[in-house]
Amino acid sequence: MQLSRWLFSTNHKDIGTLYLIFGAWAGMIGTAMSVIIRTELAQPGSLLQDDQIYNVIVTAHALVMIFFMVMPIMIGGFGNWLIPLMIGAPDMAFPRMNNMSFWLIPPSFLLLLASAGVESGTGTGWTIYPPLSSGLAHAGGSVDLAIFSLHLAGASSILASINFITTIINMRTPGMSFDRLPLFVWSVFVTAFLLLLSLPVLAGAITMLLTDRNINTTFFDPAGGGDPILFQHLFWFFGHPEVYILILPGFGMISHVIAHYAGKNEPFGYLGMVYAIISIGILGFLVWAHHMFTVGMDVDTRAYFTAATMIIAVPTGIKVFSWMATLQGSNLRWDTPLLWALGFVFLFTIGGLTGVVLANSSIDIILHDTHYVVAHFHYVLSMGAVFAIFAGFTHWFPLFSGVSLHPLWSKVHFAVMFIGVNLTFFPQHFLGLAGMPRRYSDYPDAYTLWNTVSSIGSTISLIRTLIFLFLIWEAFSTKRTPIHPEFSSSSLEWQYPSFPPSHHTFDETPSAVYLIK
């Protein structure tokens, strides 16, 4: 009975729970890889064997964190759990397809780990650029396994996206019009469209790479009239929307958390927030070549991509200032989720500012492939996406589990994490400005100080992971009953009679839900 409940589940809450647990495990593995990277870089000299094994770990770390930690938790976990509850739907539109979306992920993960383990591993970086990923430079099955892994993960995401889009369009309760949709629902809605439009391009690119490697096509081989730059265009046409896919659901969760703990019914400027999400989604498809400023594009092309990239800062700024306006004049409840949300706004803004620096094509030619870029995207991912995940987790954990986290220890967890990630990534700005390149396992002695500081920070973050495990164990072992929120939130998920809401949310289809707005 239990086995069939979890293997053949058609229940959005069970599938969401599976996603959350899988994402937590993948996050542990990805974190372990990051600690290996930072241990190698803690001192000059070689710790592992050579740059190939180092780059295999870097590649696996990136792909694990993106495809098996952030996306399954944000879209699969929070999306499945919350969206039906927030729109008053009994479940997702296609419950069995929902189950398949999840069960494509573990085999994909196994293929990725296999790609790191066979031959000499996939030491290409997560971008898998040819000719480094060609049959010549990476002979053997490694890259092929990584390609198949991405195919499965992509298929899973496309199926999930179809499911979310259909659910949100067709299964809203009466009275839940699009201009009343909670912001988290909006953010996943836009994210699903981004996935639907970008993943097929990646699938095409990696399929062409697969045939280049195995059946002598020359899509990316100049010897046969191909062009390796074509792969970069195809990859980044997926890769840039992907980074917005990683952060948009986080934006949605942060909007809910800030409005809730500020005691507001809704975030400031709801409609502006919605248009900002949509604008970010559209603009995300128009800026991909800012990842390629160093490959020799025309000056007018570079000028366009510089300008377009800077325009994305406008809707992002609308969101940041709307969050701050939501906080304005409120009597804040300093619960843990709010700390994560405030940390998110501050650190994501810093990451956004370094992004504006890198948008300048002339500056980027100097900073491209240095640790400055690493610092930039870890500020928006490791302190943006991950902080949003923890804000959402600490906020909705009582709803999901029926027990509450320890109020003091969860704040300690936040404090240790905050110190750890900042100590890890802030010094990397200095290393990048001083010219330390990415994807090398060793460096001149001049870079020792900040690398050592950075590695100490990663050790602190590792301790933070153990505190988190303790937090979850402590919550389930003491079984403190959560109290209902003192004030009702503008979203529906808190309005159900029990924590967690019953296995089947409704015994019969609800006729109407009246929202105060």
Curated annotation (Swiss-Prot):
MF terms (GO), sorted A to Z: cytochrome-c oxidase activity; heme binding; metal ion binding
GO cellular component terms listed in the entry, alphabetical order: mitochondrial inner membrane; respiratory chain complex IV
PROSITE patterns hit by this protein: COX1, COX1_CUB
Binding residue positions for heme a3: 376
Binding residues annotated for Cu cation, in chain numbering: 240, 290-291
Catalytic class of the enzyme: translocase
Pathway: Energy metabolism; oxidative phosphorylation
Gene3D superfamilies noted in UniProt: Cytochrome c oxidase-like, subunit I domain
Lineage top rank: taxon: Eukaryota
Pfam families noted in UniProt: COX1
Cross-link 1'-histidyl-3'-tyrosine (His-Tyr) per UniProt, renumbered positions: 240-244
EC number(s) from the headed UniProt entry: 7.1.1.9
Record flagged with keyword Magnesium: yes
SUPFAM superfamilies: Cytochrome c oxidase subunit I-like
Entry similarity comment: Belongs to the heme-copper respiratory oxidase family.
PANTHER family from the UniProt entry: CYTOCHROME C OXIDASE SUBUNIT 1
Physiological role: Component of the cytochrome c oxidase, the last enzyme in the mitochondrial electron transport chain which drives oxidative phosphorylation. The respiratory chain contains 3 multisubunit complexes succinate dehydrogenase (complex II, CII), ubiquinol-cytochrome c oxidoreductase (cytochrome b-c1 complex, complex III, CIII) and cytochrome c oxidase (complex IV, CIV), that cooperate to transfer electrons derived from NADH and succinate to molecular oxygen, creating an electrochemical gradient over the inner membrane that drives transmembrane transport and the ATP synthase.
Protein name (record): Cytochrome c oxidase subunit 1
Organism: Pisaster ochraceus (Ochre sea star)
Higher taxonomy: Eukaryota, Metazoa, Echinodermata, Eleutherozoa, Asterozoa
Encoding gene, per UniProt annotation: COI
